[in-house]
Structures are given as C-alpha cells and as structure tokens.
Amino acid sequence: MLPFWIALQFLGSLPIRLPGMPSPEELGRSLLFYPLVGAVFGTLLLGFNTLLSGAPLMLHAALVLTAWVLLSGGLHLDGLADSADAWLGGFGDRERTLKIMKDPRSGPIAVVTLVLVLLLKFAAILALIESHASVWLLLAPVIGRAAMLGLFLGTPYVRSGGLGQALADHLPRGPGRKVLLATAIACVLLAGWSGVAVLLVCAVCFFWLRQLMMRRLGGCTGDTAGALLELLELAVLLTLALL
C-alpha cells in the first residue's frame, strides 16, 4: 500500500508521513492510485457538503470550493497558472515555453486564468448544490486524477530528471490501462447516463489538451498535468450543471 500513501501525500495536503524515501518503482506505481486518491477527496468533500446543508447557498458553495482547494494544497492550480503564463508568453516556442514554466513568478495571464477557472467552478458548484445533486463531488476529483494517469500513460515526459520523470519511466502500463477502464465503469455505475455524458465530454477535452501539449512541447510536464486535472474537473462540473 506504500504507492497509495505516496499518491495521497503527493496529490494533497493531508498530513501523510512515509516510512522512508520511495524507490523509483514505487513512485511509478503510485500513479495507479491517483483515481483512488480522487475518491478519498470526493468522500471528504461529500461529508463536508452534508455538514453544510442548511447554510446559505452562496456561502455553502464558497466553502466547498475552499475545502476543495485546500485538500490539494493548490498544487494543481499552480500548474495551471504556470501553464497559462507559458502558453501565452512562449509565442509557440518550445524552449521559451518550458523556461517560463519554471519561473516561480505569476504574470497577469496566470491570474486571469485562475480567476476564471475558480469563478466557473464556484458557479457550477452553486448550481449543483441548488439541484440537490451530490455525485459530482465524487466524479470530478476522480476523473481529474484519472486524467493525470491517462496523460502519463500515453504522453512523453519532456523534463529529464526529477519526480515526474520517475513517474513516467516506472508507471506499469498494463495495470494503468485496467485502472482507467475500471474508473470509467465506476463513473457510469455511479452516475448512469450522466456519467456517460461526462466521460464523453472529458475525453474530448483530454485529447484536445494533449494535442496542444504535443504540438507545443512534444509531451507533458508536471505543470501541464496539473493544468489538465483542473480543467477536466471544471469540465465535469460544467457538464453536470448544464445537463
């Protein structure tokens, strides 16, 4: 179960202590547990959402979104911000784009992107709370993290060295595909035809975003993986809110 704890520590802000430095193989296997980590986060959000029943709707939605961000420690929002800055500032150049991604400073495009994504998430969460739906609290975190697994399964990692390289190099491909299939089946069983619609929308978004990465970078980075997660979570919320 060490790969699960590695995934939970890496993807979230929960106080997880590992017994020692994991091996590259254990890091690679941790990717298999990303959808399960999403299910853990979704379960925690479901419990928090239940506690807030009866609260004013806008406050309810704002608190759920805040808890959502805090669970991940803002890790993936940081990747989204870096990717937004790099995509605009890179002017189509691969090396310039990668260089901007490594810059810790956030430019105006990063700020605008974060505001828009969080605003849309808030609006979708508010609409879903008003409709008394709750399955979205599980679907969005699970699909977002399953997308990261899918990205590493089928996309080269373009930064040599570091954690991302170990994840990409030591990910078990066969079990990874089985985990993705099991995740898709679970989503359909959980949400029925709504789950099918969500999966179709997310598949289109996934392949479009992956194509952008391949054209610009020839692969993915940790930042673009985080951006993918955030945007697919948003796609889940918007799809369910509009159904």
Swiss-Prot record:
GO terms for cellular component: plasma membrane. Keywords: Cell inner membrane, Cell membrane, Cobalamin biosynthesis, Magnesium, Membrane, Transferase, Transmembrane, Transmembrane helix. Pfam families: CobS. It comes from the Bacteria. It catalyses: alpha-ribazole + adenosylcob(III)inamide-GDP = adenosylcob(III)alamin + GMP + H(+); alpha-ribazole 5'-phosphate + adenosylcob(III)inamide-GDP = adenosylcob(III)alamin 5'-phosphate + GMP + H(+). Pathway: Cofactor biosynthesis; adenosylcobalamin biosynthesis; adenosylcobalamin from cob(II)yrinate a,c-diamide: step 7/7. GO terms for molecular function: adenosylcobinamide-GDP ribazoletransferase activity; cobalamin 5'-phosphate synthase activity. The keyword Membrane applies. It is an enzyme of class 2 (transferase). It is found in: Cell inner membrane. The keyword Transmembrane applies. It is a multi-pass membrane protein. Its EC number is 2.7.8.26. InterPro entries: CobS. Joins adenosylcobinamide-GDP and alpha-ribazole to generate adenosylcobalamin (Ado-cobalamin). Also synthesizes adenosylcobalamin 5'-phosphate from adenosylcobinamide-GDP and alpha-ribazole 5'-phosphate. Belongs to the CobS family. This is Adenosylcobinamide-GDP ribazoletransferase. It comes from Pseudomonas syringae pv. syringae (strain B728a).
